Amino acid sequence: MKTLTVKEIKEHLQSVSDEKDPFIEQCKNDERKSVQALVDAWLKKNERLSAMREEWQAMTSFERSLRARGYQYIAGIDEAGRGPLAGPVVAAAVILKEDCEILGLTDSKKLSKQKREDYYSYIMEEAAAVGVGIADAHEIDELNIYEASKAAMLKAVQALDVAPDYLLIDAMSLAVDTEQSSIIKGDAKSASIAAGACIAKVTRDRLMDEYAEKYPLYGFEKHKGYGTKEHLNALAKYGPSPIHRRSFAPVKAHE
């Protein structure tokens, strides 16, 4: 082992994926402290990866069970933006490929903005199909937020390039003929729903950033339309913008 430099060992470890690889045992027996530090770091990283793979197995249990029953195109559906005082509610439907592995994907609210952006790019590129549906503030005021969320979800399903044969929906049911399951807190239990939640969240955040440029008085780029103190103060000072939800009490109070 000592014929290899520390740099060479570091490079070789990057190609090792199994803790039972003889090279790992050789590293453990190397007396150099720098090599011990490298192997300790590799073992910790491998442990994290193993845990993430176990989590992925749990997150895909619904999908695997459905595929075993003969379903092929399983769409996970979720929305973002039910709570804000301004902007649309955005839904996304995602059909993941059977062999995909998106380690670390979970409830989008638990992910950093950068992680969401990274997953968004990967899902958009690697998913079998992605559909997005939007219900704007006017539609929300006409229907109510619950029905508008369902309308956005229906639009997302209709926007898929591949017709799904099963729907996994976060805490909702849709009036369609396609077989479906409603899963409470589905974005923490189903990979397909988590993928849909991520696409919906990133899409909506980007829309709110665009609205921030169009209506700069409200700080939409910071709070994305949620009722923060800054947002409520701007509402009181300037009144509602064209994208505010006038059926929501805090907005109605300032018309």
UniProtKB/Swiss-Prot annotation:
Official protein name in the record: Ribonuclease HII
Record field: catalytic activity: Endonucleolytic cleavage to 5'-phosphomonoester
HAMAP family: RNase_HII_B (MF_00052_B)
Main location: cytoplasm
Residue ranges that the Swiss-Prot or TrEMBL entry lists as coiled coil: none
Cofactor note: Manganese or magnesium. Binds 1 divalent metal ion per monomer in the absence of substrate. May bind a second metal ion after substrate binding.
Cofactor section: Mn(2+); Mg(2+)
Example of a GO MF term: manganese ion binding
Family: Belongs to the RNase HII family.
A Pfam family: RNase_HII
Organism of derivation: Bacillus licheniformis (strain ATCC 14580 / DSM 13 / JCM 2505 / CCUG 7422 / NBRC 12200 / NCIMB 9375 / NCTC 10341 / NRRL NRS-1264 / Gibson 46)
Gene3D superfamilies: Ribonuclease H-like superfamily/Ribonuclease H
PANTHER family in the record: RIBONUCLEASE H2 SUBUNIT A (PTHR10954), RIBONUCLEASE HII (PTHR10954:SF18)
Primary role: Endonuclease that specifically degrades the RNA of RNA-DNA hybrids.
